[in-house]
């Protein structure tokens, strides 16, 4: 929990915007992901998630994310529901271990999400992703994403543009 709060604090410096939760629900595509353990987001990696749908319920006390993973060309659909824990807008969910996540900044057509995954072996992975309502980012969105990645302590060379390999169904 402390790691996601530190990640959120660092990344919030890149995303000075406040979160408008009315803009969270909708159809989204993961454009890019960065992680400190980059193998987790490579092709076939368990944290390489292709977002499709995000919904808010109970005043956004719960966020539902529908996404695909692609292992050896086989797309598998997943839906996870994150429950807000506390006042810091941090959500917890079980997927490939224990996860905490937070929407760090958003607009009408893009959002940046930060997460910390602790897998079954106890390995902790910091991750920052950006999703959009189209298949590309504006230069400003790209800049905010890269700044968030740097502020999370993740090298820019660990960014993977996953939209290029998204062959899963809409």
From Swiss-Prot:
Signal peptide: 1-16
One example GO MF annotation: small molecule binding
GO cellular component: extracellular space
Organism of derivation: Cavia porcellus
Tissues and organs where the protein is expressed, per its UniProt entry: Expressed in harderian gland (at protein level). Expressed in hair (at protein level). Expressed in submaxillary gland and harderian gland.
Protein name (database record): Lipocalin Cav p 2.0101
Disulfide bonds: 56-60, 75-168
Post-translational modification: Not N-linked glycosylated.
Pfam families documented for this protein: Lipocalin (PF00061)
């Amino acid at each position: 929990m402390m790691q996601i709060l530190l990640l959120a604090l660092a990344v919030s410096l890149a995303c000075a915007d406040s979160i408008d939760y009315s803009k969270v629900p909708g159809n989204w595509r993961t454009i890019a992901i960065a992680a400190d353990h980059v193998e987790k987001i490579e092709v076939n990696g368990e944290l390489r998630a292709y977002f499709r749908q995000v919904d808010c319920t109970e005043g956004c006390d719960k966020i539902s994310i529908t996404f695909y993973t692609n292992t050896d060309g086989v797309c598998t659909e997943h839906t996870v529901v994150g429950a807000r824990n506390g006042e810091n807008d941090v959500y917890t969910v079980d997927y490939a271990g224990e996860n905490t996540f937070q929407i760090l900044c958003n607009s009408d057509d893009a959002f940046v999400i930060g997460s910390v995954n602790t897998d079954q072996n106890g390995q902790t992975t910091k991750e920052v992703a950006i999703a959009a309502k189209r298949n590309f980012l504006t230069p400003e969105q790209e800049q905010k994403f890269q700044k968030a990645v740097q502020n999370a302590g993740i090298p820019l060379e660990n960014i993977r543009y996953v939209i290029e390999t998204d062959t899963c169904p809409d």
